[in-house]
């Protein structure tokens, strides 16, 4: 029965891969190598294994919606704070990842660079409509293509560019042309030429006048992740350290650091959390996610100790029903078990 479920999942993914090709996501061998192990393909593969109702629930709104497009929704999650909830399963991948807007008296933060410049421009225009200001700051949570390749779209019509903030590692990886990084070209290099470096070893702040927004350096999803936290508004943008309703992507992960980073964020139990993919999360959803991370670790340690390969462990793994509904696939689970095998030596 388990084997049949996985086989059906892969058949579904092959069908969806054709759709991806037709929408020009995989337009070349170079593009395929970039996305096949990254979050672009990961999201499509995980969702291919899910029912239509599950796919619809994955990004269901829990907060007032300000605007809806074919590729994303903008929800009000706190005063002067909005979450971008991307809805790529419909076929439009303009933003692809989640992000947001944090507005203050003296400035506006845009969270994430998104997949395409049009996604960044769309968010900047929404910020101007809602706050009267074009973004003054752009903060990247990490370097993956769906979060970092569209930053050039934040250039204002008059030519003014918001301050782009990223850690040194995120900047270097974003322009390094790696397998899951943005495509390296002159436009990308120009967009990253004047990055304001975020401290990767200590918390830093952006002063928006009437609110202080904290940049928390972490790691786990990649070697350098940043969470954006407003303690007064009880809001945390966690990037891909947090996945809601979808099995996380371990392509770059350090599993022990991922768990520790998420626990650090989860201690803010009153916060509204915006993860990198999926609906807005509350403390209960974050607790289920931590439970999933723990169960993945348990399965990996048990299987590896018994001498099984990551593929064998993945083939036998199923998310416990007690953790609720998670979109998952054999490929994603095997990638997680492989990451644990690396971590445990």
Language-model features and meaning:
Residues 13, 18-44:
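N-terminal secretory signal peptides and thylakoid transit peptides that target proteins
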Residues 107-109, 115-117, 212-302:
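Metallo-beta-lactamase
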Residues 7, 23-25, 42, 54-64, ...:
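Accessory terminal helices/loops
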Residues 75-126, 227-239:
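Conserved beta-strand hairpin/beta-sheet module of binuclear metal-dependent hydrolase folds
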Residues 74-77, 102, 202-208, 275:
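Short acidic-hydrophobic surface loop/beta-edge motif
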Residues 2-5, 11-15:
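Short, low-complexity, charge-dense intrinsically disordered segments
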Residues 17, 47-84:
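C-terminal segment of N-terminal export signals and the immediately downstream linker at the start
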Residues 128-207:
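Active-site HxH/HxHxD metal-binding segment of metal-dependent hydrolases
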């Amino acid at each position: 029965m388990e084997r049949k479920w996985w086989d059906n999942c892969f058949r579904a993914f092959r069908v969806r891969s054709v759709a991806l090709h037709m929408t020009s996501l995989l337009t070349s061998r170079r593009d395929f190598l970039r996305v096949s192990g990254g979050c672009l393909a990961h999201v499509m593969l995980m969702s291919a294994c899910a029912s239509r109702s599950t796919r619809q629930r994955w990004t269901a709104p829990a907060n007032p919606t300000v605007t809806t497009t074919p590729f994303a929704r903008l929800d009000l999650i706190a005063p002067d704070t909005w979450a971008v909830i991307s809805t790529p399963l419909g076929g439009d991948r303009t933003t692809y990842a989640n992000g947001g807007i944090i507005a203050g008296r003296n400035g506006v933060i845009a969270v994430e660079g998104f997949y395409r410049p049009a996604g960044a421009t769309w968010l900047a225009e929404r910020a101007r409509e809602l706050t009267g200001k074009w973004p003054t700051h752009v903060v990247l949570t990490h370097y993956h293509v769906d979060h970092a390749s569209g930053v050039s779209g934040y250039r204002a019509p008059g030519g003014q560019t918001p301050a782009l903030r990223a850690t040194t590692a995120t900047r270097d990886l974003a322009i390094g042309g790696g397998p899951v990084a943005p495509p390296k070209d002159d436009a990308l290099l120009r967009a990253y030429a004047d990055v304001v470096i975020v401290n990767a070893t200590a918390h830093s702040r952006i002063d928006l006048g009437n609110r202080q927004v904290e940049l928390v350096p972490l790691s786990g999803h990649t070697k350098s992740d940043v969470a954006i936290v407003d303690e007064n508004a009880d809001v945390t943008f966690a990037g891909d350290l947090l996945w809601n309703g979808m099995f996380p992507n371990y392509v770059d992960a350090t599993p022990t650091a991922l768990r520790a980073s998420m626990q650090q964020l989860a201690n803010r139990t009153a916060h509204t959390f915006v993860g990198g993919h999926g609906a807005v999360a509350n403390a209960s959803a974050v607790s289920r996610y931590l439970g999933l991370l723990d169960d993945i670790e348990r399965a990996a340690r048990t299987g590896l100790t018994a001498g099984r390969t990551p593929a064998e462990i993945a083939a036998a793994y199923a998310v416990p029903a007690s953790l609720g509904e998670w979109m998952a696939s054999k490929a994603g689970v095997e990638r997680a078990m492989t990451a644990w095998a690396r971590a445990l030596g």
